Amino acid sequence: MNNFLCIQKIGFMAKKEKEEMDKKIMKHPLIFCIAIITMGMLIFANPTTATEPVEQQGLVDKARVTFENFMADEQNFGEWFRKNLHEAKGLLIIPNLLKGGYIVGGSGGSGVLLVKDAKTGLWSQPAFYTMGSVTLGLQIGGEAAEVVMMVRTQKAVDKLLTSSFKLGGDASISAGPVGGGAKSNVMTDIISYSRSKGAYVGVSLEGAVIATRAQWNQAYYGKAVTPVEILVENSVSSPGSTKLIEAVQRAFN
């Protein structure tokens, strides 16, 4: 009986101490606010660290470097590239198209697509794409190639807004000219330009399958978003794409 009364007394004292502490906190708003802020910091500290689009931003930055390298070329190829750039309604830039050995097998890589607004002349935010399942008849060892595709027709732009399509089937494609004497009489929907080890090479991408990277688009823009929303409706944006867009915009000014 004595033990029971003792336990009751201890419980009553603990409860009273808690009530006294609560009263002190409520009487001092500053203490109360600090307590709430501290709890919030513990719960929500660094909420975006794990979801920062590091890979996606890296690809955007590499795409800018690739485009600037193509624009800065002082050989005949660069002159042809710059001369025909004004025809582009879209640009698909793949900084790292991987190939292996004597190309009789597959290759692939990821890239970003930007589309020009026909009314304003402004370029869109980048959307992420992947290209694969292509057979290339070119010996470049195990090196990677940089690729820039000029999308020249609205038909090709519309195909790129779908989930996937095949080059050469859904839209015609040809390799950009190499060396001097190249004529700007190409009539295909898309022209591809490739560079490996700093040298420009004619690479046929016919048969390649291009598909959207929905998860990368979501990671980069913070929500599920379609190519149409990114490229046409301009419903999302990222500060990380500013330098790439500015580099492309300068080329058309």
Language-model region placement:
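Bacterial N-terminal signal peptides that target proteins for export
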Residues: 17-34
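Sec/Tat signal peptide C-region and signal peptidase I cleavage site
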Residues: 44-50
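Short hydrophobic targeting helices and cationic amphipathic motifs
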Residues: 4-5
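Small-residue-enriched, tightly packed secondary-structure blocks
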Residues: 51-253
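Bacterial N-terminal signal peptides
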Residues: 33-43
